[in-house]
A protein has these predicted regions:
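NAD-dependent ADP-ribosyltransferases
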Residues: 1-260
Length: 260
């Protein structure tokens, strides 16, 4: 008997318009600052924006809700590609659980030890490593971000099976990139755009055509438009054969909802 899996062999990155798809195919992925709430750690109401590229590990047959929440456009790449690039599944956490309390306690201990200047360098490094782990955490469920605060649709985030790419802390430090933005900085649209532009010029999450398993567009009418865009943006970089294979991987949202 063949073994079946709940997860997919493809990591999907969803977006809300075809221009974003074309931009990714042209310039590859770049991290963008996204708001996250760490209230689930307890004892704090921390809300900050972290640079990341998000994916979901959901089979096409179960992707309807994700399309409704995140848009009818997506690029799906092989999970092998994701693992090779250091993309990691999110650790979902429940407030007041033993594991969440353990993380919170470690953070509190590190903060207290920072008062000792002799230990400051070691503690700073430990704090960086801990933050790097925490940035891959997400509450099991809660309100989604809605323009200015977390008062959007109540969502069981666990069902999204999120994977994240977050830039390595050494790269962040080398290029003097902000590891996170305070909420006020994120809400400043002009400032946020400058932060996103800076990081996109330095950090790329690259891929090859063979890594792409699906390109999802909202309607079949857009497939021919995307054909032409692929010819224009990849013609100098990829062979005609690879471009033609890539075109066969375009599918519409309607096909998914009707056939899977």
């Amino acid at each position: 008997m063949n073994k079946t899996y709940l997860s997919a062999n493809t990591l999907f990155h969803f977006t809300n318009n075809i221009d974003n798809i074309i931009n990714i195919l042209t310039n590859e992925f770049s991290p963008r600052y996204c708001m996250e709430s760490f209230e689930f750690l307890g004892g704090c109401d921390l809300e900050i924006a972290i640079p990341m590229v998000c994916f979901c590990d959901i089979p096409l047959s179960q992707i309807k809700n994700h399309i409704e929440n995140y848009g009818g456009y997506a690029i799906g790449l092989s999970k092998e590609w994701g693992v090779s690039k250091g993309i990691n599944p999110v650790a979902y956490s429940i407030k007041n659980s033993l594991s969440t309390k353990a993380i919170s306690n470690v953070i509190n201990i590190i903060n207290r030890e920072c008062e000792d200047e002799q230990k400051k360098n070691d503690i700073d490094n430990a704090y960086d490593f801990m933050c790097n782990f925490v940035f891959y955490m997400k509450p099991y469920e809660g309100n989604s971000w809605n323009k200015e605060k977390f008062d959007g649709k109540y969502t069981r985030f666990y069902d999204e099976r999120e994977w994240r790419y977050i830039p390595d802390i050494d790269v962040i430090k080398k290029y003097n990139i902000d590891w996170f933005l305070e909420k006020e900085e994120f809400l400043d649209y002009k400032g946020r755009r400058e932060y996103n532009n800076k990081i996109s010029e330095i950090i790329k999450l690259s891929f090859e055509p063979d890594d792409i398993k699906y390109i999802i567009v909202n309607s079949e009418d857009e497939i021919l438009d995307l054909f032409r865009a692929i010819d224009n943006i990849k013609g100098d970089k990829y062979s005609l054969n690879r471009i033609n294979i890539l075109k066969t991987r375009i599918i519409s949202k309607d096909q998914i909802l009707n056939d899977f």
